[in-house]
Swiss-Prot record:
Pfam families attached to this UniProt entry: CBP_BcsE
Stated role: Binds bis-(3'-5') cyclic diguanylic acid (c-di-GMP). Required for maximal cellulose synthesis, does not act as a protease on BcsA.
Disruption phenotype: Produces much less cellulose, and the timing cellulose synthesis and structure of the fibers may be altered. Deletion can be complemented by the protein from S.typhimurium LT2 or E.coli, however the 'D-415' mutation in the E.coli protein does not complement.
Keyword RNA-binding attributed: no
Keywords: Cellulose biosynthesis, Nucleotide-binding
Keyword Nucleotide-binding part of the UniProt annotation: yes
GO biological process: cellulose biosynthetic process
Family affiliation: Belongs to the BcsE family.
GO molecular function, one term: cyclic-di-GMP binding
Domain of life the protein comes from: Bacteria
Name of the protein described by the UniProt record: Cyclic di-GMP binding protein BcsE
Length: 523
């Protein structure tokens, strides 16, 4: 008796070569889609791409799948099985058991259409366990599972899945770019081999997906190490320095072109503080999706970066940050120095972990003594923050004649993460992410008067061990010695007998009678 041959299923994109299309039994594949309608269209054409006798089942999370799934009369199987499931984490874990109650999964092709942003509230650990479970299930039952996930943040989802290559046989994204679609393949493994980091233009006509004609013969670049993709502001008006340089008018266009790079140098420009978080997200996406050979440089054209911002960009995957005061000649030398480098630092898969590093303390201003100690302890215990770079702890003792409560009224921190408390006749400040060599500058911004005129003694701790040791001593202070701020003074009544003449305020004389009429008659 001859053994049954395991079927090989195909993704619904015409003209796509088999290395990027085939899905043999015993594996899980995942495709993110920017739009719901693109996801449904891809599912319908994928069904039509199967053989006439293929066993296909579609599982939908939103509504009735029978209203959106359409069978092609001339292509694909004559009938398919349709299922619905709840949009919940419990429903996902129950999926294998529920399918076994309805069908024999052997040689079946299951297509799971997720609801919009299904995975937003599911942790990466839960996602990892579910993929591992589905991988074992498909291998045991000789079936295939294709997950179609419509979401409005496919970059974040792809970054979370990049490390799941042991459970996923393929990961790709269908990106909508206004007048065209881009099929971004992170990796795809099947009986033909392994392909990775490819981007292909797709055409959609009459609900059919086809490979763009210009992509059918195009060869994916294997080495672009000499290419330099740069923001035009980096060269400060100079023309491209060689044929390897390509200039872009904005960071967004530069980012979109860098999506296809493998080992090129990418140079972003930074001119405003509000560009930092979007730029960090772009750098994180490129580093997670395009690999360690890419050289990512940030050129600060106008002074706008704090130490925490630099740490964020470097943590997201930037090789180097060039400061604003470096001349063009120095800038070009630094760009040349990163050539041939391999990025070796670890980049977390979820960028929110990195963003939380910039403001781990959501406090500002005066805090009670115990709250102050707890906040610093939490900061010192955060392993994601750099060693001996979490901030500076300062204890200030006021000069004779000034109470510590009065000195507190002069302390006006402006940054989130800068907190203070009073106790034991001391004003204690913690300046998050402040370097010890910048302490005097920071204190001059916090106090309106020179600190030497207000305080007679100052003690500083800036290393983690020093701060932790002082924190132990601070916790020993009895609550009776904890200080409290002075009560707010009542607002003075506004002066009503004054007017402004355009230059200064002038009081208006108010006539007063020393004797009233009764006193005059009595005299």
């Amino acid at each position: 008796m001859r053994d049954t041959v395991d079927p090989v299923f195909s993704l619904g994109i015409s003209s796509l070569w088999d290395e990027l299309r085939h899905m043999p039994t015993g594996g899980v594949w995942w495709v993110n889609a920017d739009r719901q309608q693109d996801a449904i269209s891809l599912v319908n054409q994928t069904i039509a791409s199967q053989t006439e006798n293929a066993n296909v089942a579609v599982i939908g999370m939103e509504g009735d799948p029978g209203k959106v799934i359409k069978l092609d009369e001339s292509h694909g199987p004559e009938k398919i099985r349709l299922f619905t499931m709840p949009d919940s984490e419990k429903g996902l874990y129950s999926l294998p058991h529920d399918l076994l109650c309805s069908v024999n999964p052997t040689h079946y092709f299951f297509i799971l259409i997720c609801a919009n942003n299904t995975w937003r509230n599911i942790t990466s650990e839960s996602l990892h366990k579910w993929l591992e479970k589905m991988n074992k299930w498909t291998r045991f039952h000789h079936c295939s599972l294709l997950v179609i996930n419509p979401c409005n943040n496919s970059d974040k989802q792809s970054s979370l899945l990049m490390g799941e290559y042991r459970s996923l046989f393929g990961l790709a994204s269908l990106r909508f770019q206004g007048d065209q679609h881009l099929f971004d393949i992170a990796f795809w493994c099947n009986e033909k081999g392994v392909s990775a980091r490819q981007q292909l233009l797709l055409c959609q006509q009459d609900e059919r997906w086809t490979l763009s004609h210009q992509e059918e013969t195009a060869i994916q670049p294997r080495s672009d190490e000499k290419r330099i993709l740069s923001h035009v502001a980096v060269l400060e008006g100079a023309p491209p320095l060689s044929e390897h340089w390509t200039l872009f008018d904005n960071n967004e266009a530069l980012f979109n072109d860098a999506r296809t790079a493998q080992a090129a140098t990418i140079i972003f420009s930074l001119t405003q503080n509000n560009q930092i978080e979007p730029l960090a997200r772009r750098i994180h996406t490129l580093r997670r999706q395009r690999g360690s050979a890419l050289k990512i440089v940030v050129r600060e054209n106008i002074a706008s970066l704090r130490a925490t911002d630099e740490r964020l960009l470097l943590g997201c995957g930037a090789n180097m940050i060039i400061p604003w005061n470096a001349p063009l000649s120095r800038c070009l030398t630094l760009i040349e120095s990163v050539q041939g480098q391999q990025f070796s630092r670890y980049v977390p898969e979820d960028i929110t972990t990195l963003l939380s590093m910039t403001q781990p303390l959501k406090l500002r201003g005066f805090q009670p003594w115990d709250t102050f100690c707890d906040a610093i302890h939490t900061m010192m215990s955060n392993t994601l923050l750099p060693a001996d770079g979490k901030g500076v702890l300062v204890a200030l003792r006021p000069v004779p004649g000034i109470r510590v409560e009065q000195a507190l009224t002069l302390c006006r921190p402006n940054r989130t993460g800068d907190i203070m408390t009073i106790g034991g006749n001391r004003l204690v400040l913690f300046l998050s992410f402040c370097r010890v060599n910048d302490l005097d500058t920071a204190l001059n911004h916090i106090f309106p008067l020179p600190t030497g005129d207000i305080f007679s003694n100052r003690m500083v701790w800036f290393e983690d061990k020093q701060i932790s040791a002082e924190l132990v001593q601070m916790r020993l202070l009895s609550p009776e010695l904890w200080g409290t701020p002075l009560p707010l003074a009542k607002r003075a009544d506004p002066v009503i007998n004054a007017e402004h003449d355009g230059r200064i305020w002038r009081r208006i004389p108010e006539p007063l009678r020393l004797l009233d009429d009764t006193a005059e008659r009595a005299s």
